[in-house]
Amino acid sequence: MHVPVMPAEAIELLAIRPEGVYLDATAGLGGHSGLIARQLTTGTVIANDRDTRSLEMARANTAEWSDRMCFHYGSFGSLSDAVSQAGFEKVDGLLADLGVSRYQLTAPDRGFSFMADGPLDMRMDASIQTTAADLVNHTDEKTLADLIYQMGEERRARRIARAIVRARPLRSTLHLADVVERAVPRTGRLHPATKTFMALRMAVNDEPGELRRLLEIAPGLLKSGGRMVVISFMSSDDRMVKEKFKELGQSKQATILTKHPLQPSDEESFNNPASRSAKLRALEMR
């Protein structure tokens, strides 16, 4: 079972009401959705995800509360449809966890990770046309370097892009990881290919664009007094969330509930290393 990140903090800031309607924009394997559902009586959780396999697992993992659950397959751009198709106009709370689940990272056929060999896919949604293999094999060197630098925050992006272009064609995750490691040897605890893989995943799934769409759509889906909680793992994502929240606060549309982002406790970071870089921000619509 996927362990949800910062569960206590997220649930507290959502201020769950037993009869409320809550949209989990990133249901994943259902960790946060289940925590919300168990606090409801006549309320509803709308569990949304763009990964069909994850959504089916979320359905199975929340079966105990099936009478309180609705499921919707789609990207952030379709969240309005998720709410209306569940029979509601607005919600009392919205949660978005921008991380990648352990299931996605460890399933070799998904191609998200170099922990096992697999195809260079990285698509969260099978309807996406471009795969990671397309990017590494057909993108020009400068564009590839810019992508790795900007999305992966990888300072050695030019050297990595040069090595990738020279090694073409690349067909598997371990092949790519080996090429990157040869170009930029390990200097710390992180595998040298970690940021490159992250950048490719973000590009394939247009994660920056998806986050922008979420931040534009979400305020209009929340009732007055409705709360929005976002958990991000990249500094670039956290900056986008911070700026949007600041804009909503300054325009008096919302009250920011987290003056500074919350971070996992030492205990959580130890027990769930995937949570270490998490930052949680929350607001309440006026």
From Swiss-Prot:
UniProt keywords, alphabetically: Cytoplasm, Methyltransferase, rRNA processing, S-adenosyl-L-methionine, Transferase
Region (Disordered): 260-286
Localization annotation: Cytoplasm
Enzyme class: transferase
Catalytic activity: cytidine(1402) in 16S rRNA + S-adenosyl-L-methionine = N(4)-methylcytidine(1402) in 16S rRNA + S-adenosyl-L-homocysteine + H(+)
GO molecular function: rRNA (cytosine-N4-)-methyltransferase activity
Protein EC: 2.1.1.199
Alphabetized Pfam families for the sequence: Methyltransf_5
Keyword field contains Zinc: no
Binding annotation for S-adenosyl-L-methionine: 30-32, 49, 88, 97, 104
Principal subcellular localisation of the protein: cytoplasm
A single GO cellular-component term on record: cytoplasm
Highest rank taxon of the organism: Bacteria
Single biological process term from Gene Ontology: rRNA base methylation
Function description: Specifically methylates the N4 position of cytidine in position 1402 (C1402) of 16S rRNA.
PANTHER family (alphabetical): 12S RRNA N4-METHYLCYTIDINE METHYLTRANSFERASE, S-ADENOSYL-METHYLTRANSFERASE MRAW
Family as reported in the entry's similarity comment: Belongs to the methyltransferase superfamily. RsmH family.
Name this protein carries in UniProt: Ribosomal RNA small subunit methyltransferase H
Organismal lineage: Bacteria, Pseudomonadati, Acidobacteriota, Terriglobia, Bryobacterales
Gene: rsmH
